[in-house]
Regions:
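Gly/Ala-rich beta-loop-alpha elbow adjacent to hydrolase catalytic centers
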Residues: 161-166, 170
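Short glycine-enriched nucleophile-adjacent loop
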Residues: 170-179
Length: 239
């Protein structure tokens, strides 16, 4: 079965001028945001970002995606394709109210904003269940605030992505943006994340989101099939 690691092994040194930025590059951003770093604002090179992250690797962390994020980072850190990547405004928040993470990437003259999915914490799973009966949740409101703060006046090519719960946050935050900021978003990539309650699914805001929305779920997905959504691409590739 094709994985993101297969993509990295083949394309890691192929520049964007030869193979354009695509959904697997966006998936890589959605994986890197799981790394257990402390918050930072200033832009970091991939080299500096990798150094900080790898120093924290052997600590005890919640979540199945953290080992995968380190696997991807190790293969990515010296890749020519991503040599000019910048990472900034990293948020890794967990308290009694929320488990929330986000990060902004600059790559190939594009802005990519990635939202973190659920880790192994209790509050992270509680939030997943809240999606079944509440909108907007506290974390969805945080994602909107983050997006509003990170789309700049001169941004023209903004992509918003996320895996699992992060995919839902990507959709919800773009859906609730003011129209001037909404127009700056080119695409929203939801990688195996749940949809919406029926009221939001039937709303005008959701219908306006659809032309920008790509939902990618692997065969046999459970989380990505929850609630109401459209524009599915069923794939055989896995994270």
């Amino acid at each position: 079965m094709y994985t993101v690691m297969d993509y990295l092994k083949y394309y890691r040194d192929i520049p964007f001028t030869e193979v354009s930025l695509n959904q697997l590059d966006f998936l890589i951003c959605a994986i890197l945001v799981y790394l257990p770093l402390n918050d930072f604002k200033e832009a970091k090179s991939l080299k500096d970002f990798s150094k900080i992250a790898l120093e924290l690797e052997n600590k005890d962390y919640d979540g199945m995606m953290i080992p995968k994020s380190y696997e991807v980072l190790k293969y990515l850190q010296n890749a020519k394709r991503y040599a000019n990547m910048k990472i900034m405004n990293f948020v890794n928040l967990k308290n009694e109210k929320t488990q929330f993470g986000a990060c902004k990437f600059l790559m190939d003259k594009k802005t990519i904003i990635a939202f973190k999915g659920t880790d192994g914490s209790t509050i992270g799973w509680v939030e997943n269940f809240r999606l079944l009966y509440d909108y907007p949740t506290y974390t969805q409101r945080l994602s909107l605030n983050y997006l509003e703060d990170n789309i700049k006046f001169n941004d023209k090519n903004v992509y918003v992505v996320g895996h699992s719960k992060g995919g839902n946050l990507a959709m919800a935050s773009v859906m609730e943006l003011s129209r001037p900021l909404f127009k700056k978003v080119k695409k929203v990539y939801n990688f195996d994340g749940p949809g919406f309650l029926k009221k939001e699914f039937d709303s005008l805001k959701y219908r306006e989101l659809l032309p920008k929305l790509v939902n990618i779920i692997p065969t046999g997905s459970v989380v990505g099939s929850l609630l109401f959504n459209k524009n599915y691409k069923i794939g055989r590739a896995h994270v």
